[in-house]
Amino acid sequence: MEIGLREWLIVIGIIVIAGILFDGWRRMRGGKGKLKFRLDRSFSNLPDEEETTSAEVLGPPRVLDTHKEPQLDEHDLPSMSANPRDNKRGAGSEKRGDKKRKDEPQQGDLNLDLDGPSLFTARDDDFPDDKPAQRITEDKDLPPVEEVLVISVISRNEGGFKGPALLQNILESGLRFGEMDIFHRHESMAGNGEVLFSMANAVKPGVFDLDDIDHFSTRAVSFFLGLPGPRRPKQAFDVMVAAARKLAHELDGELKDDQRSVMTAQTIEHYRQRIVEFERRALTQRRG
């Protein structure tokens, strides 16, 4: 019996429908296992439930409402000065941090020459120094910091930034734990060369404890860059802005300027103008 066109179309239609049903069944089976493991790592370190904190943020003594943003004061940040020997001291402190940061992501280094020192030292009344006499001797001929550019990142979550997530984020931005128990961004991602800027805990006492980082949390951190400081401050400032934005974006924070106002594009441009004005004044003084 000869099969006509109609019969052929029916057979082909049945085959196509069977193929579609089989493909859908195969995809459903394959998708069951995948959905179980598609977790967002950026939320792995967030708290299981909201926590309230009554920690006092740097600044004059005050009673804080836990539902309000913490008050920051750039005057309580550690004072800074250039110090050519700080890189050697930082190497010892960095070994302490190596236990907590395995397999750190590597990024490109900032393209600066390596002939000028610049690092930050603590103010004696805020951060006790084991060798204050030696520090005074080393710093007596170094220019004092005249201006500080501050960018604070405040957590929108009342539980604050959790230690492991915060540590991972800033390591990815090239900051390394070092002098004064705070983090510094050197011109090299490996932690070598002059310091471009630093990051301190904005909640007293202003430091980080890597030995207890798993239980650490803070409502805010402050990035700061001193002038005079890095030899190319505008480039260093751009790196600092990028690090602060990355932290705010990935850990749900909000950028604030040194007046506790929301950081805007106009604010960032104003900071850059402050750098230009400082360089102009410094050049005028050298010529005079």
Swiss-Prot record:
Belongs to the ZipA family. Residues 23-288 are cytoplasmic. Essential cell division protein that stabilizes the FtsZ protofilaments by cross-linking them and that serves as a cytoplasmic membrane anchor for the Z ring. Also required for the recruitment to the septal ring of downstream cell division proteins. It is found in: Cell inner membrane. Residues 48-138 are annotated as: Disordered. Residues 64-77, 85-105, 122-138 have a biased composition (Basic and acidic residues). It is a single-pass type I membrane protein. The chain crosses the membrane at residues 2-22. Residues 1 are periplasmic. One of its GO terms (cellular component) is plasma membrane. InterPro entries: Cell_div_ZipA, ZipA_FtsZ-bd_C, ZipA_FtsZ-bd_C_sf. Interacts with FtsZ via their C-terminal domains. Keywords: Cell cycle, Cell division, Cell inner membrane, Cell membrane, Membrane, Transmembrane, Transmembrane helix. It comes from the Bacteria. This is Cell division protein ZipA. GO terms for biological process: division septum assembly; FtsZ-dependent cytokinesis. Gene3D superfamilies: ZipA, C-terminal FtsZ-binding domain. It comes from Pseudomonas syringae pv. tomato (strain ATCC BAA-871 / DC3000).
